[in-house]
Amino acid sequence: MRFRYRAGRQITFPANPINTFRGALGYQLVRIACIQRKTGATGCSGCPVFEKCAYSQCYETGPGHIGQGEGMANEDVPHLMVIDGGFAGMQTLTEGSLFDFTVQLYGRAAESSPYIIVAARNAGMSGLTSQRVPCDLEEVIDDSTAKTVWSAHTDEIQLPRGNSLDLSEPGLLPHDSGEMKLRFVTPVAFKDKASGSITLEPEFSRIIGSLLRRYSAFEASDGRQLNWNFAALTRIARQVRIANLKLEPIYWERFSTRQQQRVPIAGVIGQATYIGPVNMFQNLIQAGEIIRCGRSTTFGQGKISVISTTRLSERESSDVFIDS
């Protein structure tokens, strides 16, 4: 859903406008969705409706939202919401300017659409950025159909029809060699499983691993379990090598209300060329253009696009793996 606002007066967004909108949206979503506000309890821990709450589904996604047990930490569960900004940060918009934010909801979080729309309207009325600039929500548009979901003129919600993303398991044989070029549109970063630290190295296996986790989690949140051979797919993905990198590191900070401190976030943008058994992963990678990959996707990171995919001839593919 694309949320179109009109600035009530001159407004200047910080480096990452998405973080500003996400914070304002979350604040208003708590106000309309949280039942614990009436009991004096703080946080989502122990809430009896945690798994059904619109706020927790989008902001505090946990194992229960994807049908998993308590062995998985919340930070390892892919968020069911991703936000995009339709403009760059660190710029001043004049009074009356139109600007957009896009919210994508995955799995069971799609049920939260009405709450998100009301919260987005309230966020604009309360004011955006630290200057609390009032911004009127003009309309909400379904990007997939270009139809109006809500407008200030009618003040009626016409819920968008959910789009399904049905993928078949990548075929394990044969392992045709190919070349794939990817663009990292917004900063991409990954969590290294061995060390637990954040890495900016866009290894192909890390991209595939992230996409497998995200897609399986979104499917599970809708009650569908994937019976794919994840171990075999991961082993094949590790055979893919980086042929060329043109990357630029991006560093920024966000203020964490929960931690009451600024939290650094990093990632890389640019292009990467991969060579090896990439063709079998083409559908999964293309799905990644929708579901994102890596860390901090809820803050707009992890947006990728496929530049090209080429099947290599036998001679070309054999030369790739010969040490010079």
Question: Language-model features: where?
Answer:
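RNA-interacting cores
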Residues: M1-S324
